[in-house]
Amino acid sequence: MAKYDFVMLWILTLTAAIAAARPMVVDKGRQITYTGLDRNGIEVFLGIPFGHDTGGKNRFKPPVAVVPPRGSHINATVYGPICPQELRAGSRGKLVISENCLNLNIGRPKNMTSHDKLAVMVTIYGGGYWVGHNQDPRWHADNMVKESVANGRPIIHVAMNYRLGVFGFAQTTALRTERSENAALRDQRLALEWVRDNIAAFGGDPKRVTIFGQSSGGVSVGMQMLAYGGKQPVPYQQGICQSQVLEPGITGNFTSTAMELVTDKANCTSGDFNSEAALACLRELDTETLLAAAIATYQNGVDHNIGDIWLPSVDGDFLPDAPSVLVAQRRFAPVTSMMGWCEDDVTRFVYPNITTSKGVADFIASYAPNVSRKNIDTLLKLYPTDEFPENKTAGLSRDFYRTARIFRDIVMTCEPFLVGEHAAAEGADAYFFSWNQTIAPSALGVLHGADLPYVYANLSAYIPPGSPIRPTASDYELSHRASRSWSTFGSTKEPSLPGHNTFKGFRKSFSKHNEILVFVAGGPNEGLSNIDDHGPHSVIGGQKLRERCAFINSPEMIHELRF
């Protein structure tokens, strides 16, 4: 018995010691306690709810904030559920899906207090508004936080969940009447408001919050800048848009078509998918049935916006007008921004068998069917075949790379110029970058998402098991500079910090004499480049971005591209 008592005492003592070692945050004003975990040399707080269950009668509706009672203890040691979505085979059974998914994770340096007031970086994940969640190890910012500490400008990182697909972007007349469109963007806004109101208890500064995202995450940052036409106060101070800020198709019919297909597949069509009866039927379905209908009707491919069919809606409320109109009228939050693209951002979406000008024209017409033949011909003239290489070894023609460059500029490159120019006119600094290095070199170049492993200083998370990819010393060095430049931007509103291991000379893009500067990140010619510098060592100048983007950003092209 004595031996048993000793063992039990030892177990209880060990358990108490482990519990005592766990990081804890006490919000004294609200009398709420959060218990987290130590992970990879930082402290993390997982699965913190910021919005109530979005299922049942709350489906498609704007989120409702969670307000814990005074004296609450929140166990933030386990991840919360992810929002309904199509899972990869390897993730099935490992992740909990629920409409009660509005939660966020926080990562911070060790041994902090509420008096520290660190800058805050908030990730909005990408994934085509179809997949994504805050448990994805690719978005883990443990190394980013540690890099920021080593750089002398420590940050706190936050990763949110938001609704996806039909759950987040349902679009009907009935929903618009009750102001329930753009539910996903409203989820994001609520998470940012939670950060504004609560992050001080974790040692964060609510007046130094940067939102950043890649692909549809970048579009989300853009939409948050445009939210409410800039008439409401914003719960952040800077934004970073990686590989998209706006998106062609937002004012088109991709989402309404997808909505009609889902409603019909779910047997909720009563003659009109826009009706209140159809909406009531969709709200009565269980999560699995509605998700199955969405998966069964999901359309991918170039002729379906490369899979981006669930898009923000011009609802007259969150987005009071078309994004291009809001930008042109300068109805947006004039915050400091950083926007960029990867050198060969969309190459993997282009058909490899394109070998002629007709093939180029047909591809553009398939992607953007409302662009006139006249304007497609103008694009072909602006991007002559002989300005592009061919890769005989890979079997890729000049017209393949020509198509990829036109497509990249339409989707990724020219919209930052549009937004940045108007933001600069409102006194908001804009920084442009072109990403020019990858951990996985190929004939396709520096692809969509190539920047992410470096920004998060998390190269291994982007290498599939069994892959022959081996990052080089240059890759690891770039990951230090990139991650520290992103966190430096969050701390100082500038990505370069003299005397620190950040990008050197990364200055704002609109400065004087009508020049436009782009920082080339990575590759053999890293550094600031003028888009009009056509010298032999200029990476950007030879791309004729001023002339080409002036056409792509013209009112006629914007109308035909539907944004």
Swiss-Prot record:
Pfam families assigned to the protein according to its UniProt record, in alphabetical order? COesterase
Looking up InterPro entries in the UniProt record yields: AB_hydrolase_fold, AChE-related_enzymes, CarbesteraseB, Carboxylesterase_B_AS
Give the top-rank taxon of the lineage listed in the UniProt record for this protein. Eukaryota
Give the signal peptide range.
1-20
Q: Which cysteines are joined by disulfide bonds?
A: 83-101, 268-281
Q: Does the keyword Plastid apply?
A: no
Tell me where in or outside the cell this protein is found: Secreted
Q: Which GO terms describe its cellular component?
A: extracellular region
Entry annotation: catalytic residues: 215 (acyl-ester intermediate)
Quote the catalytic activity from the record.
a triacylglycerol + H2O = a diacylglycerol + a fatty acid + H(+)
Keywords for this protein = Disulfide bond, Hydrolase, Secreted, Signal
Asked if the Swiss-Prot or TrEMBL record annotates the protein with the keyword Secreted, the reply is: yes
What EC number(s) are associated with this protein in UniProt? Answer: 3.1.1.3
PROSITE patterns xref list: CARBOXYLESTERASE_B_1
Q: Assign the protein's first listed, main location to one coarse class.
A: secreted
Recorded GO terms, molecular function? triacylglycerol lipase activity
Name the family.
Answer: Belongs to the type-B carboxylesterase/lipase family.
The family database entries (PANTHER family) matched by this protein are listed as: ACETYLCHOLINESTERASE, CARBOXYLIC ESTER HYDROLASE
Name under which the protein is recorded: Secreted lipase ARB07186/07185
